Every structure is written in C-alpha cells, then in structure tokens.
C-alpha cells in the first residue's frame, strides 16, 4: 500500500459514481502554525486527516522571492530585499502583497497570462493594432481592479470596433459560433463541451441539447469590415436567437447549462443574458473556475485538475475549500 489520495470512479451501464479514497501517511500532526485565514483552517484539517505534517514557515528571503515571482513575474531587486529584510513590522508580509498587486507590473504580468487564455495574438502584421489594443484593455482592467463579471461581460458581449471596444478582438480570433461557445464554456465555466457536439457522454451530464442551446447565445453576433485591414466591427443582429440542433434538426433557443430555454426579444442581445446566467447559476461554476485557476497559478496544481475540466468524474481534492473560496470571491 502506498499512502496518498485518489479519486475512484465506479460505473455500471450508463451510471457512474465517484469517491475519493485515502490511505493516510500516518504521521502525527501536531503544532501546526497559527491560522492566518480560512484557507489555513481547511488545509490544516486535511493534513491532519492524511497524517502529513505541514512544511516549515518560510523565512523572509524565501517569502519575498516567491511572492514577487508569483505576483509580478520577476525576482525582487536588491533594494526591495534590503528594505523587506530590515523591516521588523509584524504585518510586513501582507503589506508586501498589497504593494505588489497595486503596481503596474502586476497588471502587465497577469495581462500576459490572460492574453494567452483569450487567444489574443496576431497572425499577421495587419492585426497588430487590434492585438495591442486588447492587451492594453486587459492590463488596464487589472490595474483598476475591474469586477470580474464586468470583465467577462465586456468580452463576451463586446460590440463596436477596436477603438470603441477593444475586446471585440476576441471575436476576431474566436470567429465561429461553435468556437465562441466552446471557449466561453471552458474558460469561464471550466466545462469542456466539445464531446457533447456529437453525443451525450455516458458518464457526464451535458447533452447535445445543452451544447446547441448554449451555442444559441452567440447566434446573433454580426461582423463587418471596420475600414482597416485586420479589424472588424462586431454588433448584435436583431432577430430571434436560435440555432439548429444537428441531432434533431430542430431549432433551439439559448439556455444555460442544465437550464430552461430563455425567452429573449429580437432586440435584446442574448450574450448579456448569458453573463447574467453565469453569475447566478446554482452550480457556481463561474466563481469556482476562477478561484481554481488562481489556485493553480499560486500552488502549481488546481483543486480541480486540469483547471478547466470541472465534471462529476473529476472531483476537487478539497471540495469544501473550493466552495469556501468561491464564497469569499463572491
């Protein structure tokens, strides 16, 4: 027997159930550090359960290096190290974090990460203006601490040209209804719907109906030439939002995953209703996916791993902690 923890799936015909099996290391866990926040409470409880003593509290030099790398993507300067190591304040570590996340370097570092997630790239010289405008918008969003739901809404429901709305660049790279639906679901809800296009997975909950109804949120996106090479105007085309379910060959209207079809007027942009649903859905995938993505950034592995693959057969290692993080974020 090897100590550790693993998720085990049991299946019978078209039914499946998952539980996490644990073989404790068996070492007594005593004298854990003082809890700094609710996260420590969950982690220390898990360490005691599996019999794994916590690591020693890092020294100041190690803490400074790790935090600076994780928040602004570089090593601390000599001057920063001198000031931090000389500081005898009891809250200097929290103050360091607060200082770093208020810098332009922080905004630049995470703008690079989100540019990659949002496929913000240029395939030719004509797209340079668009690419840079979208990057600058992402950076400014982080620098001004824009609310996350507003950040997502301004991307998914972007309208206008590059000057009016830089996130319209997303529709340049993700340029089909299918790609927009699949990217939005995987990036913002941690849910991979690609397989549901062709069949209902025997062990997962999303069906072809879910796939096409979710796609219908993007069915009224229109694009036109903005007058410059490589730039488009994105707009809402008035009309009934619907797509054809290729399995039934019948039209379906927009619906959140596992939800009923929505009644949307011809003049309303369904993309706004998509973000409204994301924020309020009882599954809370919108919040859980983001906090899990940041957990992976800071700790190397998500509570759900891969970080964009939330499903019943891929459970979180710490489900209560994931819920608590989502609570705190909301």
Segments (PLM) and residue ranges:
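Short, structured secondary-structure elements
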Residues: 2-12, 16-260, 267-275, 280-330
């Amino acid at each position: 027997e090897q100590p550790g923890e693993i998720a085990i799936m049991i299946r019978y015909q078209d039914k499946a159930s998952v539980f996490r099996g644990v073989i404790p290391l068996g070492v007594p866990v005593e004298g854990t550090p003082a809890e700094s926040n609710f996260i420590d409470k969950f982690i220390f409880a898990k360490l005691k359960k599996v019999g794994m003593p916590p690591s020693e509290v890092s020294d100041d030099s190690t803490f400074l290096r790790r935090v600076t790398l994780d928040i602004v993507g570089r090593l601390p300067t000599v001057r920063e190290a001198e000031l931090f190591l000389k500081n005898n304040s009891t809250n200097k570590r929290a103050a360091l974090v607060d200082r770093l996340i208020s810098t332009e370097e922080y905004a630049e570092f995470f703008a690079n990460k989100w540019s990659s997630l949002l496929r913000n790239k240029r395939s030719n010289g004509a797209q340079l203006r668009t690419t840079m405008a979208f990057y600058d918008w992402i950076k400014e969003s982080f620098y001004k601490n824009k609310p996350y739901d507003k950040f997502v809404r301004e991307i998914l429901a972007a309208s206008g040209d590059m000057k009016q709305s830089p996130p319209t660049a997303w529709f340049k790279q993700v340029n089909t209804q299918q790609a927009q639906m699949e990217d939005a679901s995987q990036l913002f809800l941690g849910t991979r719907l690609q397989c549901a296009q062709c069949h209902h997975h025997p062990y997962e909950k999303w069906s072809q109906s879910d796939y096409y109804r979710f796609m219908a949120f993007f069915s009224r996106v229109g694009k036109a030439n903005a007058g410059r090479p490589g730039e488009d105007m994105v707009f809402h085309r008035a009309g009934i939002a619907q797509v054809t379910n290729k399995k039934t060959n019948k039209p379906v209207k927009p619906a959140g995953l596992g939800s009923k079809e929505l009644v949307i007027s011809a003049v309303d942009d369904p993309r706004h209703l998509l973000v409204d649903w994301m924020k309020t859905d009882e599954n809370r995938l919108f919040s859980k996916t983001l906090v899990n993505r940041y957990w992976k950034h800071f700790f190397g592995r998500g509570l759900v791993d891969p970080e964009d693959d939330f499903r019943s057969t891929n459970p979180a290692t710490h489900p209560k902690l994931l819920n608590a993080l989502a609570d705190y974020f909301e």
